């Protein structure tokens, strides 16, 4: 399971980004594998099972899927709990905002995973209005990359903007989560 998690956070993560229109350079890909190889090592995964590149990661994922059973009831419960977090989080003040976030996340799941997996995980299919969201995200990514990937300085600006956005999300979670909040 740890190998599958490792592969999910490296190979499958990058495939999802590409599906959302993000161009990943070979240097960035190498960096992601290096990061997750180190994390896998710290988690105790034997080094021989830690892929250094896409080819080896694909082989590992294929090997893992041949010995792993289909998703079970526990997998569906985990998916349900992850989606429920959208409704339980305290970042958004109003219920309708949290429901909107849930629908957007469901639409991304249906875009990134195939129909069989979504059904097996019992992820509700989003309403048609929400199914356009991943297409908007993809288009936005493609446009921003055309603007910011022209040269190194523009690329650095894009990286810095992304970093600031991530820090804002983290700050929002910290600011809006009550100190005594428990799931």
What are the language-model segments listed below?
Residues 1-183:
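Mature, function-bearing regions of proteins
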């Amino acid at each position: 399971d740890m190998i599958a998690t490792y592969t999910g956070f490296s190979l499958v993560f990058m495939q999802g980004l590409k599906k959302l229109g993000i161009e990943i350079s070979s240097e960035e890909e190498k960096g992601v594998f290096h990061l997750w190889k180190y994390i896998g090592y710290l988690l105790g995964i034997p080094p021989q099972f830690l892929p250094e590149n896409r080819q080896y990661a694909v082989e590992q994922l294929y090997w893992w899927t041949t010995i792993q059973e289909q998703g079970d009831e526990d997998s569906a419960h985990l998916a349900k709990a992850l989606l429920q977090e959208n409704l339980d989080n305290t970042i958004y003040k109003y219920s309708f905002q949290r429901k909107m976030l849930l629908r957007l996340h469901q639409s991304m799941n249906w875009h990134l995973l195939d129909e069989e997996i979504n059904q097996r995980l019992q992820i509700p299919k989003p309403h048609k209005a929400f199914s356009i969201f991943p297409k908007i995200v993809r288009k936005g990514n493609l446009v921003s990359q055309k603007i910011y990937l022209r040269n190194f300085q523009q690329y650095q600006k894009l990286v810095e903007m992304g970093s600031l956005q991530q820090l804002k999300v983290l700050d929002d979670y910290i600011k809006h989560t009550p100190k005594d909040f428990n799931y």
